[in-house]
Amino acid sequence: MAKILAVGTVVAIASTYGTASSMTALTNAANAVATLAAGHGVAVGDFVEITSGWGLINGRIARVSAVATNDVTLEGINTTSTTNYPAGQGVGSIRRITAWTNLSQITSGLSVSGGEQQFADVTEITDRTQQQIPTTRSPIVVELPVYDDPSLSWTPTVRAASDSAVATAVRMIYPNGSRLVGNAYWSLGDVPTIEDSTLRNSVTLTFAAQPTRYAT
């Protein structure tokens, strides 16, 4: 059991990507293995964006834990359920993230909302107690309050992601070395606010797919 302080958390946006590499196979496994075309260039430790015929992992970001020629292991991508992941239907492509840009001047007010399980009411007329069954989860939204400074090196990258309305990867590294990666829609405020006599702004991330958490 550990209590992890948030001070020292590093947030980054994917600033460049490699060319997408097509899959010829994607396995059902606790850590799915993608067979890629030759010359893919993917190495152990790389983070990749997954495009897949399996909707539950489409758009997710994963770390590569092993490479054996053209077989690439996607750490933390569990596809063992053939109900959720029908065999042979998951092929697509992966795109390697080749550079990250760290965000600076994030204040201590980082907040997370969403992700809560939603339920449908299935109460029947004969029931004396309401019944519910789980459906979807609400979207995860992370708000990063920052001290406003348009000259910061990360601003053009975040602004481009905000303007494009295309999901772009985010990486959060916590002080204990654990990390979270995901694909999110970025939004950067156009007009700064004033708080405690300083200019502030807000970077909002709305996750487009389930994030992946790693202990190290």
Which residues does each predicted region cover?
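Small/polar beta-strand repeat architecture
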Residues: 3-7, 13-29, 37-40, 54-128
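Short, charged, solvent-exposed linker or helix-capping segments at domain edges/interfaces
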Residues: 155-156, 214-216
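Oligomerization/assembly interface segments of phage tail-like spikes and tubes
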Residues: 121-124, 131-150, 197-212
